[in-house]
Amino acid sequence: MLESKKEALLSELVAQLCAERNFAFPQVQGFDELWQHFRALVNTREPAPISPFWLEKQDELLSGLLAEGGISSLDDAAVSPLNPRIRLWQGDITRLAVDGIVNAANSQMLGCWQPGHFCIDNAIHTFAGVQLRLECAQLMQAQGHEEPTGHAKITGGYNL
């Protein structure tokens, strides 16, 4: 994806995220600064629906970024010395072309709320898209209590 296309998409996305919170659009230049603001805004966005138009732009951006960064397959993961049916991966979990990943999430299942924090929760929630936090919130509301340690939920992967 061309740098100009990424910047245009990010500008649209950041503008909408700022507007929904009554924030002024940040005085930023270039992809890197826009990306930092985008990450901070989505990392701290409450789980809520957003327009299909915004989701389309977000999905276009995220799928393009993931493709640019390179996707790793199961064959790139090491076979466990204890069980040949288990593969071990060390690296960016958002770059795996697999059917599922496991996140040691917090008991609210809503990810990290620290803007721009480089943790696995933020990586997964950023690259999956804002749909993931909304789905997790809906699952937790239906469940009516926090997720116990050692339990799991299956969600959509969205852009992952």
Q: At which residue positions do the language-model features occur?
A:
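Macrodomain-like recognition of ADP-ribose-binding/processing modules
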Residues: 1-160
